[in-house]
Amino acid sequence: MKRNLLCLLAALLIIGSPLMTSCSSSEDTVESPAKKEYFTQWNTCEALTALKQYVEDVTDPKSDKFIPVEDRIATFDMDGTFVAELYPTYFEYNMLEYRVLDDPAYRDKAPEDVRQAAQAIRDFVRKGTPLPSGFDMIHAYAAAKAYAGMTLAEFDAYVKAYAALPANGFKGMTYGGGVYQPMKEVFDYLKANDFTFYVVSGSDRFICRALAEPLGIAPNRVIGMDVKLKSNQEGEVPGVNYTMGKEEYLVRTDELIIKNLKTNKVLQIAQEIGKVPVLSFGNSSGDCAMHNYCLGNKKYPSAAFMLVADDDQRDHANLAEAEKRRKQWVEAKYHVISMRNDFRTIYGPDVVKVPFTFPE
């Protein structure tokens, strides 16, 4: 009996077991991550076609464009790239305006320069008054002061509480919920194809962490504007001369370290990631240096994508500015994503654009 069983096993190995053949056939029909359809919220467009072809090429071990998993690095700007920036302005601008002019816990304590920065934002969104020249830095210094003294947990809670408020200019959406649904699909697609992606934003790093958390983006993959931190007991002693105790905790200071825009994005990528990205996504001139750094990758094929906010039906948009930017990005050889033409939805079917409203 035993001899007969051994003969049967030998015969199966020679001619091939039907069961084994069935398993092999099943595996052959499984879609690779690069070929599976992830993009249900996109229309067919040049940018999406280019992205899918790129990913298929660089994830194919037989391709001369193949990129090892450890070098599949993608960088994403945040505001206007995967998070709304027109409700009615950037999240961090909206929050500073509230903090300084409306928050009863702080509004009477705000220094004059911080108050002026917040008022400039209010006049910009309510009256259309142009922001002062160099307002990126004016805001950065004001924000550093406005949240100084908060612990990291307190600031995180403050950001999330503001993010839970209804977004001005939309029905059915909170500030934190203002995420471009098609771009979430890009995250899922890249993750399935073993890319590591980083948020590289001009907004405060800890604001970005709070907004990126619901998307499953880890805190250590978020780079942004930074202020100096210190121990709550450190006082004026430099950190290099101070030993933090077990019961102490970190607080924000009013000292700005870096505003993470333009070439500063490249410097931060080099310092914190240590590799040149192969994919880059953005929406403004503040992202061009990051894109160019990516496209200058000497080791691997690379690609850069720019979103254009050209949909004034489902979002708040400046069409003249959008067209101007579109031409710039085409000339720069970036792939252009049109929110109007390429996105089947922006925020989801239950979100409706409405006019901005402001208190009297």
Language model feature labels by segment:
Residues 45, 149, 263:
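Electropositive phosphate-/nucleotide-binding environments in soluble metabolic enzymes
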Residues 29-39, 56, 65, 71, ...:
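C-terminal cap/substrate-recognition subdomain and adjoining C-terminal extension
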Residues 15-16, 90:
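Residues in and immediately flanking transmembrane alpha helices
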